[in-house]
Amino acid sequence: MSFLQTLLQSLRDNIAVLEHEVDLHNLGTPQVWDPEASTKFDDPEHLISWQAFEAIEKIRVDVRALDAAVTPNHIKLLEMGLQPARTSALNVAVSLGITDAITDLGGDAKLADLASQLNVNEQKLGRVMRTLAAEYIYQEKQPNVFSNARHSKNLEKEGSAAQFLSLLSNEGLRSSAGLLSHMTDIKTRDSYLATDAPFCSAVAQKGETFFEYISHPENSGVALKVIKGVLPWLNNLPKDIAQRAADGKVKCVVQDYFKDNAAEGDIWYLRGVLREYDDEDAIKILTKVANSMRKTPGSRMVINEIWNSSPFIVSNQNAAPSTLTPIHQSRLPDLANLMTWDTLFFFGGKERSVPELEFILEKAGLRISRFFQFRTITTMVECSLA
């Protein structure tokens, strides 16, 4: 069977699984045009089955393989080089509030009316709309008449998704332009410090870290994106949280990572800690945790992170790539890798692969005892004493 036929058969099999799960759990109808057809399917609060999630993963991988197989290389590479235009178009959409404007204009918006409402050039707006329509974000129902589609419904200007996407597609895109110099400059190429992140040279340009930059009043708009987009739960804190905290049983203990732990416990939880340090310092931190764990028999350490992952290891060139994805790593590995790049752009730090994690754990006298994957790109790794 040819490679294309192998991909086609894999897609048939996984689409059958997905449609069965969608029907079984009443998840709606996956499609691209109707914003309401896939409400449950898209709702992050509605946990889809593992079978559905795994089918989605496999379909995405094989669809991309099919696209790569049938696309001449000069077209494939040209399209990849032009990706920043798509990202910029997305930033225009969320920053101007195109989704809201289409709704305000009755759902089917003439391009001239849309440009007038947004106070932008009609011809340039048309190019933005068609760029995003090609990605199934909006739909052109008639010539120069645009409507929202399934993937644009979460782009309301004040929504947390739009704020987060604006951060990625504006400041994130600008930071990414500094990656090459970050990787080749003798001062920064081996550094994981926040002060050496691409953001500092490409955006801040004053040696300031990301958080120093957004602390200035003139950069409050970026800070707002972080609050509304990255930390949307801050908008929904209970009014009596201060009293609840005062009445709680949680005790905060000041801790220096590089000194003996000031507290004891059954569970040690690390999130965004190890990524801040190179291997030498990360091993020192883990060694301190391991020493504390020895004081409490059966204690564990849990690490919650996104890992640098391999979308597939090509051990068989005739197999569908969806069958070649390693198991113990982040799910949606292509997306996980993009997210680890974005954290490097903004904050520096060393995002690791699971084998790289195992290396520093072993040096500290620890090992992975359990590996928990979620239906997203983050994982929980439970570690115990070796």
Spans of model-derived segments:
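Alpha-helical subdomain
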Residues: 1-129, 140-142, 228-386
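Residue-level detector of alpha-helix boundaries and kinks
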Residues: 51, 83-84, 117, 164-165, ...
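Alpha-helix initiation and N-capping motif
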Residues: 63, 74, 161, 176, ...
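Class I SAM-dependent transferase core
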Residues: 87, 205-234, 339
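Extracellular structured ligand-interaction cores
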Residues: 93, 135, 176
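A short, conserved structural fragment
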Residues: 133-145
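Leucine-rich, amphipathic alpha-helical/linker segments
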Residues: 147-216
